[in-house]
């Protein structure tokens, strides 16, 4: 509710700082300008010598907005301090030396698959070039309205990444010999 009067947010840092800003904006559709003062500037793409022109474009409202899909998480346990939006991906992953886990996956209430794997990634198009890509997921255009479901080290050779519409409700039940799994949202645990 405190964000209702905000026209835009300026993020000073790297991509990690911009991802933190996204968690506070959530689904409020407030534009974020990422100025790169950090190490990685894929998302925070404005470099120091472009700051003046970027601020000028904000003031004159002559900027373009890239719309990006977000992943939103609802869980039956408290996660991420109640800040459940991510720009890159959501993951379920086994902990440390825990054995492989079974992830029963449902798409819009219908059973999709049970993944026997080290984990599962649900990536947005923005996140498709990160962790999901390193697990053989496809690169998806940023403006495509989709999510990528990518298994991490699956036990079955026939299991491949799957692209689904971003308005899908994806549900999971995790089963393992122990409670040795964790969830992440844009690298937050």
What function would you assign to each model-found segment?
Residues 1-27, 63:
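N-terminal glycine-/serine-/threonine-rich phosphate-binding loop
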Residues 15-17, 40, 126-129:
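Short glycine-rich anion-binding loops that position phosphate/pyrophosphate groups of nucleotides
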Residues 29-31:
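Proline-centered loop/turn at the N-terminus of a beta-strand
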Residues 42-118:
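Catalytic core of DAGKc-family lipid kinases
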Residues 59, 141-145, 149-154, 163-176:
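Structural signature of FAD isoalloxazine-binding scaffolds in flavoprotein oxidoreductases
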Residues 79, 92, 97, 108-111, ...:
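ATP/nucleoside-binding phosphotransfer catalytic cores, i.e., glycine-rich phosphate-binding loops
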Residues 105, 127, 183:
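Short aromatic-centered micro-motifs
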Residues 114-117, 122-158:
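Gly/Ser/Thr-rich active-site loops/lids in small-molecule metabolic enzymes
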């Amino acid at each position: 509710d405190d964000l209702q009067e905000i026209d835009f947010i300026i993020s000073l840092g790297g991509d990690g700082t911009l991802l933190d800003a996204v968690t506070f904006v959530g689904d409020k559709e407030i534009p974020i300008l990422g100025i790169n003062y950090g190490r990685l500037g894929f998302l925070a793409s404005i470099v120091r010598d472009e700051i003046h022109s970027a601020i000028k474009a904000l003031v004159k409202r002559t900027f373009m907005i890239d719309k990006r899909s977000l992943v939103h998480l609802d869980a039956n346990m408290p996660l991420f301090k109640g800040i459940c939006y991510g720009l890159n991906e959501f993951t379920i992953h086994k902990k440390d030396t825990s054995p492989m886990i079974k992830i029963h996956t449902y798409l819009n209430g219908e059973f999709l698959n049970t993944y026997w794997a080290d984990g599962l990634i649900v990536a947005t198009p923005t996140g498709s070039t990160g962790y999901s890509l390193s697990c053989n997921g496809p690169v998806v255009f940023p403006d495509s309205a989709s999510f990528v479901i990518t298994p991490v080290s699956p036990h079955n050779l026939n299991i491949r990444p799957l692209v689904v519409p971003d308005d899908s409700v994806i549900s999971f039940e995790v089963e393992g010999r122990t409670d040795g799994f964790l969830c992440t949202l844009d690298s937050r645990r």
